[in-house]
Regions:
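Phosphate/pyrophosphate- and phosphate-bearing ligand-binding catalytic cores of soluble enzymes
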Residues: 1-153, 169, 173-181
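Phosphate/pyrophosphate-binding loops and the adjoining catalytic core of nucleotide-dependent enzymes
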Residues: 162
Length: 181
């Protein structure tokens, strides 16, 4: 297992298994993981040992609630696209093509991870609506079905338009994180 990855996403396991229950084993001695930038900002200046699991939980819920639609009122599939990992050459080309704009990135093995949300936003999709589907106005990584009337074809059509526009502007092909069934 890794962040947003597991054997269940591999080709030989996809559509073969259904997860119906999960057991977690939590370490009672590990410290808080504050690697997410929003958490770093919230707990800036605090001694890590003084931060409780409840505080971290509440901070994560507040952060997500500020960006994501309420699933009880606005259906979505959550994060729709994976953050792409690109080569140093591709990253440098994006930086050169966007002077004066800070390109968010995370150095990873094999290159740079670029937030898909940033790429989508740079293509002008944030808040865009078409038919019964839309790109969430606070988080362009999320495709929503606000009226609960969207067909699978409408979602896939918007998905494909986003993929094409990001590829045309940046030379990066986004990969859906959602599982089409």
């Amino acid at each position: 297992y890794a962040y947003r990855d597991s054997i269940f996403k591999k080709p030989d396991a996809r559509r073969r298994y259904i997860i119906h229950a999960v057991d977690y084993e939590l370490s009672p001695i590990s410290g808080p993981n504050l690697s997410y930038p929003a958490l770093q900002k919230i707990f800036e200046g605090r001694d890590r040992s003084s931060i409780t699991p409840t505080e971290i939980r509440n901070a994560i819920i507040a952060t997500r609630s500020s960006k994501l639609p309420n699933p009880a009122t606005v259906p979505s599939a959550g994060s729709f696209f994976k953050n792409p990992v690109i080569s140093e050459e591709c990253f440098n080309a994006i930086v050169a093509g966007n002077p004066g704009i800070s390109v968010p990135n995370f150095r990873v093995e094999g290159g740079y991870k670029i937030p898909a949300a940033w790429l989508i936003d740079q293509c002008g999709w944030k808040g865009y609506g078409e038919g019964n589907v839309a790109v969430w106005h606070l988080q362009p990584l999320v495709i929503v079905n606000p009226e609960r009337k969207a067909s699978p074809d409408e979602v896939i059509s918007l998905e494909n338009k986003i993929i094409v526009s990001v590829r045309e502007k940046f030379g990066i092909t986004l990969t859906p994180e959602v599982e089409h069934i």
